Amino acid sequence: MAVKIRLRRMGAKKNPFYRIVVADSRSPRDGRFIEEIGYYDPIKKPAEVKIDEAKAQDWLKKGAQLSDTAKSLFVKAGIIPGRAKTNEA
């Protein structure tokens, strides 16, 4: 079973809110998940990110893969080393 750490969309139309979850890579984006480890609210200024670092590190040690967006959030939160992606053409 390939496990991914990714975002699950919540909220209302035109007002997204994301939960950071650990899920089987074959399950749909908003479908079944194993564990919730944080949230991301892009509407607030500045955007609010809260990640349970202990749970995240535990899942990464177990071999969970990060989605691209989750990886950038983890870098910004300082959970994993690296540089935040920039939008360069």
From Swiss-Prot:
HAMAP family: Ribosomal_bS16. Coiled coil: none annotated. InterPro entries: Ribosomal_bS16, Ribosomal_bS16_dom_sf. This is Small ribosomal subunit protein bS16. Keywords: Ribonucleoprotein, Ribosomal protein. One of its GO terms (biological process) is translation. GO terms for cellular component: cytoplasm; small ribosomal subunit. It comes from Desulforamulus reducens (strain ATCC BAA-1160 / DSM 100696 / MI-1). It holds the Pfam family Ribosomal_S16.
